[in-house]
Swiss-Prot record:
Entry GO terms, CC: endoplasmic reticulum; nuclear envelope; nuclear membrane
Positions of the TIR domain: 9-185
Protein's cellular compartments: Nucleus membrane
Organism: Arabidopsis thaliana
Catalyzed reactions per annotation: NAD(+) + H2O = ADP-D-ribose + nicotinamide + H(+)
Name of the coding gene: TIK
TM annotation in the entry: 195-215, 223-243
Protein name: TIR domain-containing protein
Length: 255
């Protein structure tokens, strides 16, 4: 007897990925940072795609953003591609923003795989599994064409590639993705003050302390009115602020 499907909550982000390949090494880290940013995320953690495929499609339709994480083994899963088809349909209707993410796979390889007439489209790490999957489903030409259309469409979008030389660690890669998701959801990417604002606040507090508090409670109040005091405290405040800015939301790369 089929279990009853409850109406899902509205998700902000749906993550489409090859579970047993990426869950532990990348996706868990990405999910953590999204949730730390206050973003509601849906991930199919049970890895029983066949049981509730329609349910997953519903979750996609309830979402505002979908992250399509392409990896070397992505095309070993027909369920990943079926989800991608639904994501593409929602994207064409302007009901969903899809962001392609290329994790340890070349973006041009993924794009070539989606073009059945393209030269050299069958020799890549992504292309070969896709070729095999299409052969296994040769009796379902409409389904295969849907996969190819979805791949062509989604990979034309501006996304993120782990192979970009700017990313030394997964942490930097993840933080850029989270920043883009927040931008698409109209969530302020930085709630901190600017350096000018912090400096102004530090000067204001400094003046209040030096001319109103120190004279009442400290014997050597003249020191707190010297340039050394003002410059020193301002430098400490700004250094602390910059340290915080560089380290906020950073977690160590997953092992």
């Amino acid at each position: 007897m089929d279990e009853q499907v409850q109406e899902p909550l509205s998700d902000q982000v749906f993550i489409n990925f090859r579970g047993d390949e990426l869950r532990e090494i990348f996706v868990n880290h990405l999910e953590l940072q999204l949730r730390n940013a206050g973003i509601n995320v849906f991930i199919d953690t049970k890895e029983q795609k066949g049981r509730r495929l329609q349910y997953l499609f519903t979750r996609i339709k309830k979402s505002k953003i979908a992250l399509a994480i392409f990896s070397k083994r992505y095309c070993e899963s027909k369920w990943c591609l079926d989800e991608l088809v639904t994501m593409n349909e929602q994207m064409k209707e302007k009901k969903l923003v899809v962001i392609p993410i290329f994790y340890n796979v070349r973006s041009d390889d993924v794009k070539r795989a989606a073009n059945p007439d393209g030269e050299g489209n069958l020799d890549g790490e992504f292309s070969l599994p896709f070729k095999q999957l299409k052969q296994n489903h040769a009796g379902e030409p409409e389904r295969v064409e849907g996969w190819e259309r979805a791949l062509r469409s989604v990979t034309k979008r501006i996304g993120f590639s782990r192979s970009n030389s700017k990313y030394k660690h997964d942490t930097d890669f993840v933080l850029d993705i989270v920043k883009e998701v927040k931008k698409q959801l109209n969530i302020p990417t930085d709630n901190s003050w600017s350096a000018i604002g912090v400096a102004f606040l530090a000067i204001t507090i400094n003046l209040i302390f030096s001319f109103f508090i120190a004279p009442k409670y400290l014997p050597d109040q003249k020191f707190f009115q010297t340039p050394e005091w003002f410059i020193g405290t301002l430098a400490v405040v700004l250094a602390s602020w910059f340290w915080y800015k560089n380290n906020q939301n950073k977690a160590p790369p997953p092992s």
